[in-house]
């Protein structure tokens, strides 16, 4: 059981990876209040160098790039499945994250890995690798 999430902070062109076993379904609530609150929440976790979950186990993830002022994420039980609610949430999030480019990670953890320069294909479940190619 769990709602596994990968939490990443990019700063000074380096990536710090953190892990939370229980926050994927509520990740949206931790991000809502802006970058300071989000970064504080992420840094309360122990760093997990090189700890990437694959696309089967990762149920939510966030990457906050403090240098480029970008937020890339997916997760949150309601906004993941209710698209109209997600649209409203993202509009509200833009007000709380002034100056940041906010993006939904439509391909899950592989979008974050790709952004960070990590081998995103290694995070795909082997049974899926042969069936599709993410372009």
For every predicted segment, state its role.
Residues 5-9:
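Short beta-strand scaffold segments in enzyme catalytic cores
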Residues 1-2:
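A short catalytic or substrate-binding loop motif that flags glycine-/basic-rich loops and adjacent residues
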Residues 36-135:
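Low-complexity intrinsically disordered segments
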Residues 14-47:
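Short, flexible N-terminal segments of the mature chain
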Residues 10-14, 66-67:
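Short acidic-glycine loop/turn motifs at beta-strand connectors
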């Amino acid at each position: 059981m769990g709602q596994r999430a990968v939490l990443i902070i990019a700063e000074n062109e380096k990536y710090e990876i953190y892990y939370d076993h229980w926050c994927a379904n509520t990740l949206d609530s931790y991000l809502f209040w802006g970058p300071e609150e989000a970064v504080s929440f992420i840094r309360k976790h122990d760093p997990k160098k090189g700890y990437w979950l694959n696309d089967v186990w990762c149920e939510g993830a966030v990457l906050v790039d403090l240098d480029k002022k970008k937020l890339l994420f997916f997760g949150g039980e309601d906004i993941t499945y209710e698209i109209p609610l997600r649209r409203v949430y993202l509009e509200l999030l833009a007000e709380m994250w002034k100056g940041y480019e906010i993006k939904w990670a439509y391909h899950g953890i592989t979008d974050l890995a790709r952004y960070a320069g990590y081998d995103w294909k290694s995070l795909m479940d082997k049974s899926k690798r042969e069936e599709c190619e993410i372009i």
